[in-house]
């Protein structure tokens, strides 16, 4: 199958777009003038992208189209003109189109977002946009491909009291007969997916700490929560200018909180849009986690102003050049601004593990994956493009050195600014900066699916390393195991890390300086898993003092992954973490708890005595450290100590420790009775979840009331998620009903499922409910949207049996899965992996728990 692209007989140079939304009919009227370069004068038609657009007229240099042939499936319209029309044209011509469209509620194209006015209590709407990947064609007919860059001049028309925003600053604004007409200055050359415009009742705050205006817009009543974002954005823009040695080229930066938004944010050039929760911060009521999340999202989107906007991938298979870079740069800048957050340590337990988890599935895809149409393109906005892409950049930056890496990146941006680039162009720039053959080492990592597991065999003063493709199911076939990954070994011993060693073949032997202590993948910078002998695992578990935080996180994650896939026994993982009860790093503890939670969720349908024993194991692990630290947040507690306390407290509550649960209930009762200082912001999620887990209709009503009247957008989401934790049948049905009756916004459709998925009753009822309402769910949510992807993942991947796998497969075999077939395949692979793990190690885990007396 080949790319579904437009013919190259014309090339767009400039768009003049005028749009007027109608908030009563939920439609919009538009007119369009496109300056075209004529590449072939023998044609008599122009093909253009569109979706859900009505064409009222089309003409080129005064000659009317004689017909408009629309192909909704291909999302293309052919404008047919009289024979000879183009023969009489010069090298360029102006195409004019009058059209109208739907101001939809699908969070795509030019759409409406519903909200409640905080001042008046009225239900209102804002008209906003989400063009990436292929929805600019929903807003106006266009040549909707990333390498067909052009300039854009936008005019918006509406009632006079509404605010108009677009990528550029205002050129002129007039009021005629009660309507406002705003024309914006012409953009630089850019891709259609970055065009943005908003018509809404908005207020703003700004920062003057950058050479251009930096503003944060929100609906009335929320504007005061935008100052953190405005200040951070100004600082970040200045930092990126200095880092890349390239000025931000637009005359302003607007960031807007949008009430219904399918992703987290969108990097539209000069007009970045966000979910409310990912932009606005009530500092007094926000957790440290939320503050860090907002900072990362803002810095990710602002990095895109260079990576993606200034230099754009040539086609969507190069999406990682946008998303991988923006992800890496957000962590890089966060680390520069807030070193106490220890973000590069967190990276290993966050982004790297997210990448490995998805890439361990047979249904994963390469970083550079061939995509041909809109349905395929929308499905690659996943952990491969974002997390594996950024993990690859982290690996390269460690190999080349950060300073050299940034130098090469700056060269890449300068060479291709206002244009398009391919992955090879990046390798060339990094090679020029470093003098190393970057392409030969890195090319395979982007072109091939998966990653290796490295098996270590020890000899006298030597190790033999052998690589195979890693699959979480542990059943890699010979034909799937042909890739030889160039592995940067980063061999660590007591003298440091040797970054010169590379495994370029299936198997090779290396000298050891120190047999007593060594670790492959020092500081966990590589994208692979390491499998040691049981004896080496036992040694490493007692050598924590010789290992960095990243090393310890990596060992925990690797041990769990090797257990899940059958490379080692699950007891190996349990023994490792049992030796680390005195661990001081919150990052390592978070990985321990995450990995243990993965084990528990795989065992969720096992007998109660086994689940209780796993809870006792968890409590044995965490209670001593929790007792040593205490759970109260002190005024002098660092970011790291606060995170550690809440991680341990949460594990204790989740595993049934009655003392910690009673503390959580006390805090909640005080909070619900009006003492808003009763729960530290960082503890709010665990407190709400604990109360919900303990159940009761009275508590349900209290949490539901908090959901309807939250003190912050973060609290609203915490409450909504907690509603899913109630196991009572009637309360569970009530929560599910909110997803379809308008109580829960479509953007938050999956949030209650995050709570429902953690208990057996919820898992089974959620799947039954999804089957009952699938047609409505599929109609309500866009096929390729992150929201539907979340629903599938949360609704399906908690099953752990081959029987469930067969039933789910059979159900979807009768459904149209276009637009989410890849997500579905990944969900089924996840179930298969869990089923194999639990069937293989069921008795081994039971024996371990019995022998260590956790079954008492």
From Swiss-Prot:
Active site: 301
UniProt KW Transcription keyword: no
The protein's required cofactors: Zn(2+)
Binding site for Zn(2+): 300, 304, 323
Residues the record marks as site: Transition state stabilizer: 386
GO cellular-component term (any): membrane
Cofactor note: Binds 1 zinc ion per subunit.
GO biological process terms on file: glycogen metabolic process; peptide catabolic process; proteolysis
Other facts noted in the record for this chain: Present with 77000 molecules/cell in log phase SD medium.
Family: Belongs to the peptidase M1 family.
Listed name of the protein: Alanine/arginine aminopeptidase
Organism: Saccharomyces cerevisiae (strain ATCC 204508 / S288c)
């Amino acid at each position: 199958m080949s790319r579904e692209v437009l013919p190259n007989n014309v090339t767009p140079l400039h768009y003049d777009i005028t749009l007027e939304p109608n908030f009563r009919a939920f439609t919009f009227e538009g007119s369009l003038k496109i300056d075209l370069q004529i590449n072939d004068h023998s044609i008599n038609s122009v093909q253009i992208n569109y979706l859900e657009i009505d064409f009222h007229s089309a003409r080129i240099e005064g000659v009317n189209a004689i017909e408009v042939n629309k192909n909704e499936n291909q999302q293309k319209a052919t404008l047919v003109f009289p024979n000879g029309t183009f023969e009489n044209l010069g090298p360029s011509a102006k195409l004019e189109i009058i059209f109208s469209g739907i101001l939809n509620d699908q969070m795509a194209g030019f759409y409406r977002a519903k909200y409640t006015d905080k001042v008046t209590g009225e239900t209102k709407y804002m008209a906003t946009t989400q063009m990436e990947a292929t929805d600019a064609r929903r807003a106006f007919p266009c040549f909707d491909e990333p390498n067909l860059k052009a300039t854009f001049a936008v005019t918006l028309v509406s009632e006079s009291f509404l605010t108009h925003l677009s990528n550029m600053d205002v050129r002129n604004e007039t009021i005629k007969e009660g309507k406002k007409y705003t024309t914006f200055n012409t953009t630089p050359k850019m891709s259609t997916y970055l065009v943005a415009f908003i018509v809404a009742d908005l207020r703003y705050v700004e920062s003057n700490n950058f050479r251009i205006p930096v503003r944060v817009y929100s609906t009335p009543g929320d504007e005061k929560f935008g100052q953190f974002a405005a200040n951070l954005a100004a600082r970040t823009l200045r930092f990126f200018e200095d880092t890349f040695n390239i000025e931000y080229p637009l005359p302003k930066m607007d960031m807007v909180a949008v009430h219904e938004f399918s992703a987290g944010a969108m990097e539209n050039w000069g007009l970045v849009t966000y979910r409310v929760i990912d932009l606005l911060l009530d500092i007094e009521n926000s957790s440290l986690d939320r503050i860090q999340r907002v900072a990362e999202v803002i810095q990710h989107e602002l990095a895109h102003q260079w990576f993606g906007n200034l230099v754009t991938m040539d086609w969507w298979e190069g999406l990682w050049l946008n998303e991988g870079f923006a992800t890496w740069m957000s962590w890089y800048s966060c680390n520069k601004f807030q070193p106490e957050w220890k973000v590069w340590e967190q990276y290993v337990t966050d982004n790297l593990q997210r990448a490995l988890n998805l890439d361990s599935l047979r249904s994963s895809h390469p970083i550079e994956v061939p995509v041909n149409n809109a349905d395929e393109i929308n499905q690659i906005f996943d952990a491969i493009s974002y997390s594996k892409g950024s993990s690859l950049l982290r690996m390269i930056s460690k190999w080349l050195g950060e300073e050299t890496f940034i130098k090469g990146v700056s060269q890449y941006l300068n060479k291709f600014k206002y244009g398009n680039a391919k992955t090879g162009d990046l390798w060339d720039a990094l090679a020029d900066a470093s003098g190393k053959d970057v392409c030969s080492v890195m090319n395979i990592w982007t072109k091939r699916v998966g990653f290796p597991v490295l098996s270590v065999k020890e000899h006298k003063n030597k190790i033999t390393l052998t690589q195979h493709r890693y699959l979480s199911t542990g059943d890699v076939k010979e034909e799937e195991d042909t890739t030889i990954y160039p592995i940067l070994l980063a061999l660590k011993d007591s003298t440091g890390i040797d970054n010169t060693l590379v495994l370029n073949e299936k198997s090779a032997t290396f000298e050891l300086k120190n047999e007593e202590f060594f670790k492959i993948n020092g500081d966990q910078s590589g994208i692979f898993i390491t499998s040691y002998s049981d004896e080496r695992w036992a040694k490493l578990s007692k050598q924590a003092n010789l290992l960095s935080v990243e090393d310890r996180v990596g060992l925990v994650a690797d041990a769990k992954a090797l257990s899940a896939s059958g490379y080692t026994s699950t007891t190996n993982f349990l023994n490792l973490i049992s030796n680390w009860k005195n661990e001081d790093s919150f990052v390592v503890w978070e990985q321990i708890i995450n990995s243990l939670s993965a084990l528990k969720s795989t065992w969720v349908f096992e007998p109660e005595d086994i689940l209780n024993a796993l809870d006792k194991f968890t409590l044995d692990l965490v209670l001593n450290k929790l007792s040593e630290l205490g759970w109260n947040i002190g005024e002098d507690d660092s970011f790291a100590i606060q995170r550690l306390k809440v991680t341990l407290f949460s594990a204790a509550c989740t595993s049934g420790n009655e003392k910690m649960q009673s503390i959580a209930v006390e805090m909640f009762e005080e909070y619900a009775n009006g003492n808003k200082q009763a729960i530290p912001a960082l503890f709010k999620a665990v407190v709400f979840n604990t109360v919900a887990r303990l159940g009761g209709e009275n508590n349900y009503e209290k949490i539901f009331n908090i959901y309807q009247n939250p003190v912050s957008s973060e609290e609203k989401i915490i409450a909504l998620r907690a509603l899913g934790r109630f196991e009572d049948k009637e309360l569970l049905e009530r929560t599910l009903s909110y997803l379809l009756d308008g109580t829960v916004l479509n953007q938050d459709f999956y949030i209650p499922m995050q709570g429902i998925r953690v208990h057996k009753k919820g898992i089974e009822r959620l799947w039954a409910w999804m089957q009952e309402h699938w047609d409505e769910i599929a109609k309500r949510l866009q096929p390729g949207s992150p929201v539907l992807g979340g629903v599938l993942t949360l609704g399906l991947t908690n099953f752990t049996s081959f029987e469930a796998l067969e039933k789910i497969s059979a159900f979807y075999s009768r459904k149209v899965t276009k637009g989410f077939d890849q997500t579905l395949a990944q969900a089924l692979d996840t179930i298969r992996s869990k089923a194999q793990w639990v069937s293989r190690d069921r008795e081994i885990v039971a024996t371990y728990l019995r022998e260590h007396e956790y079954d008492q």
